[in-house]
Regions:
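Conserved glycine-rich
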Residues: 143-144
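Short conserved segment of the HATPase_c
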Residues: 103-115, 135
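Short helix-loop "hinge" at the ATP-lid/N-box region of the Bergerat-fold HATPase_c
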Residues: 71-72
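Short beta-strand/loop element within the Bergerat-fold HATPase_c
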Residues: 78-90
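Acidic ATP/Mg2+-coordinating residue in the GHKL
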Residues: 98
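Short conserved segments within the C-terminal catalytic ATPase subdomain
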Residues: 11, 36-46
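Conserved micro-motifs of the catalytic ATP-binding
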Residues: 10-15, 48, 52-55
Length: 164
């Protein structure tokens, strides 16, 4: 992840956004996360999606998987991770919602920073670069990411992909 971040920052890696359906992106992220989710006894689901957006398939898939992987990692056994996508003005909003541990409000503004790791997640493996990569990948395509969370109730990450 560190190498990818460095390559994105220096322009070695570029994105090539193209108009395409979002549904296969969601299904791909779920398929990739399914083994870990099943091992934890989590329910993974994607709501039916007919939305389309303009994005680089490879890099956006990586960004989405980073978010889904975190949702699986920080959701206790028996929990749920749901993906959905809806057109919203100039953007398509892709939501990853979980019933996980949540993120304290005071940390929400910092979680997209390079190397940031919240207090509640330090026991988990990682270096704090995944959400930074998500933000950078989306930004380079004209998109952005937001988070809404309450500790003990779960989190929703919303990835905004340009529709044109």
């Amino acid at each position: 992840a560190l190498v990818k971040a460095s390559r994105l920052e220096t322009g070695i890696i570029t994105t090539a956004p193209e108009p395409q359906p979002v549904g296969p992106l969601l299904e791909g992220a779920l398929a990739q996360a399914r083994p870990q989710a099943e091992a934890k006894g989590l329910t993974l689901a994607a709501e039916p999606c007919g939305a389309a957006a303009r994005f680089d398939r490879k890099w956006t898939a990586e960004a989405l998987f980073n978010v889904v992987d975190n949702a699986v990692k920080y959701t206790p056994a028996g929990g749920r991770v749901t993906l959905s996508a809806v057109p919203l003005g100039q953007f398509c909003r892709v939501d990853v919602s979980d019933t996980g541990i949540g993120i304290p409000e005071e940390e929400q503004g910092r979680i997209f920073g390079r190397f940031y790791r919240g207090g509640a997640v330090r026991a988990e493996e990682g270096v704090g670069i995944g959400l930074y990569l998500v933000r950078e990948i989306l930004r380079r395509q004209g998109g952005y990411v937001k988070v809404a969370s309450r500790p003990g109730q779960g989190t929703t990450f919303s990835l905004y992909l340009p529709r044109e």
